[in-house]
């Protein structure tokens, strides 16, 4: 939209009622009861790997390096290899082996290079999947949380915030594999 934005990225929560920030995008499981919340995207976590690895069955995971991501700030069940094995197998998958990354984007880049496989946010991996440098060999997914645009009730009705909300919804809807919903 034709508005000026100042982006501040942080995992620290900003109090919108103080009036120093007009809107925020928050990753959580449920809307916040004291704020105007618009659901932008329902995230899922999927297994992604370079197409060169030729993964087609869950058993194929036993022959590749598993990438683990530490310190994810995911309010839902952890998108871990332990949870993957419990839900989808194979039961003999050695989930204690592999490499651990402190940042999911670094794990994705290593996966692009064909060095292993990672359980990644579908939203974060979307562009890499669309370009064909990563593939999602299995249809199974682990649940993630939801991205919400949040504002106070008073700010929600401003023209610039309405324009931002509509633009964000259209951007989220334009990608393949997305799960956007207005709310």
PLM regions: where:
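C-terminal regulatory
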Residues: 18, 30-115, 120, 124-144, ...
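A generic membrane alpha-helix/interface feature
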Residues: 24, 40, 132, 150-151
